[in-house]
Amino acid sequence: RVWNTNPTHPIAQGIPESFELKEEEMYGEFFDIPKPDDVVFLSWYRGGEVFRSGCTWQRGYGKIFYFQPGHETNPSYHNPYVLKVIENAVRWAAPVMWRENLECPNIVESPESKYLKK
């Protein structure tokens, strides 16, 4: 079961309080990650194991979202709520505006330059 622990977060929009995944690979805490800015989803597994399964961070201009469900051998990507979370996360992480070139001296052409050229 995946619990929506932060229903006001943009990634959680349109996601119910909880939803079931028939099969999913189980992970457990201690999950050695930096302290998240937000925990959007928690997963619960039979036996009582709980896992921070949806976390966000912001680093500089970048936004990062980790989402645990979706092992390639399980049908998680067919779940409409998993697909909605991924869609919401892409929209959340997308830049609101293109930023000025960051002037990295060791990079000949910055990755964002192709979007800034007219």
What are these regions (language model features)?
Residues 1-61:
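Catalytic beta-strand/loop cores that center a nucleophilic Ser/Cys/Thr
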Residues 48-52, 58-118:
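Extracellular ligand-binding/catalytic regions of CAZymes and related secreted enzymes
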